[in-house]
Amino acid sequence: MKKLQRTLALVLASIILCLAFTSCSNTGKSIMTKTYTKSATESDGLNLASSATYITQDGKTKKSFSLKGKHEEIKYITVDFGDSVDFNTVVFGEAGKKVTLFEIYGSNEQDANYQFLYQSDCIEGGHTCFLGDVKYRYLRVFVNQSSGNYNVNSFEAYYLKNEKAKDLRVNAYFIAEDIKEDADFSNLDALTDVIVFGTAKFDGQGNIKFYDNDSNEVDEQYYADKVNLLKSKIGDRKINIITDIAMPYGDDNLDIKSMMNEQNVDNLVANIVDFVNKYGFDGYDMDYEFPEDKEDWKRFNNFLRKLDKAMPDKIISLAIAPWDLRFDDDVIKAIDRVEVMLYDMFTAHGYHSIFSTTVNGVNKAIKGGFSPEQIDLGLPFYSRPTNRLGYWGNYNQFGGKIDRYTNLIYFNDFDHDGNPMTAPQYINSVQMVADKTAFAIDAGLGGMMIWHYSCDLPYDDELSLFKAITDTKTAKQK
């Protein structure tokens, strides 16, 4: 499995990314501003906050939004739109990164009958809160928990719909080993694309070999049976099937350098094309996340040019970490999709994949040359512990402990090496997934990417994350 094969690399990457992605940077804030200015214009919507007044906890009325408090001081502010108005989206900004729990309530009376609407944890540089269609005159915004003195300094409210919401890609990695007759295939109803990952693996010459979950080499029929079973379960659903042949990661990635060098690259490309055609795949995805130097990037760009020329009518997809991108301009045009991995990136609180790191990562991918339409926003359907150790827990293992809003799960278990593990687990809840999906639509992104398919609850469960994506797409449509 990808996560087990690459534990060390991910832990090291998390340390690096923690320094770069712990909050929504100024560039991240700029994409939030651009997104909601553009979305409001296209939806004939207005920032309802522009004409609102704000009532402080002690009854004073202000023209601007500001919610400040001391460490662990619970405070609220009331937003008065002046009349009962329709809206579905609230956007907050914070100066700093101290808020760890906030809530939104709505009412048509200033001081009575407030209904709970929303809860989440971090705001930092920016947080889109997707509420669904609601209609209220008053909102009351609470900060319930913080790790220090806080300052929530911006508030926007919109009613945003988009006819393109229905076209948002939903692309999930499906680990080949997990394709079994007794697996849950109900979440296929949410998907437009699947990427079959693993079992097939490159060697240092670009040849393809096959391995089971215990790393034993097996006959190709073992892989073929998995693919055929998946195709039978997909049936007549309109789902693209893309293959991802596992990379030969190792010390200094010497086998990757070898398979892309001038001696082997043509063999590599030919083997990919033959493999894609043999199984009738709709495209090819490469999970080469960490080219290390100028020569690595030169080889990678050269390979992608050759691959695009060899299979121009197939989807070319790349899993990327959104930093230090050095794709040549012509190569960027040849890439159909980038699966932007916006997870395993920790805040100072030890939370991975919060909303603002997602915004920052998307912005970095755009700054790296990709158009929004090429970008699939990466979602983790798994947990990471707040102590950042190498443990990945499937979302569906927390049954009975999860609800729509809570991202922080208190869960005692053993890590992958059998050691006791007591640190809280951070997940992306149904609401967090809805928020990120709404943002992807508002920002004009091409789609969502999920690592990985088998982590979710069944599609008919009210806490299914795939269902959260579908429901948000539906709610955002004009």
Indicate residue ranges for each PLM-predicted region.
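C-terminal motif of bacterial Sec signal peptides marking the signal peptidase cleavage site
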Residues: 22-23
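Aromatic, loop-rich ligand-recognition surfaces of beta-strand-rich domains
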Residues: 27, 60-114, 123-164
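Glycan-recognition patch characteristic of GH18 chitinases/ENGases
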Residues: 162-272
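Substrate-binding surface in catalytic domains of secreted glycosidases
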Residues: 171-172, 204-222, 290-404
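Conserved, mostly hydrophobic/aromatic
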Residues: 194, 286, 338, 377, ...
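An active-site-proximal structural segment forming one wall of the substrate-binding cleft
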Residues: 261-284, 303-310, 321-331
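Active-site groove signature of glycoside hydrolases
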Residues: 269-297, 341-344, 449
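Glycan-binding loop/region signatures in secreted carbohydrate-active enzymes
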Residues: 374-439, 459, 465-478
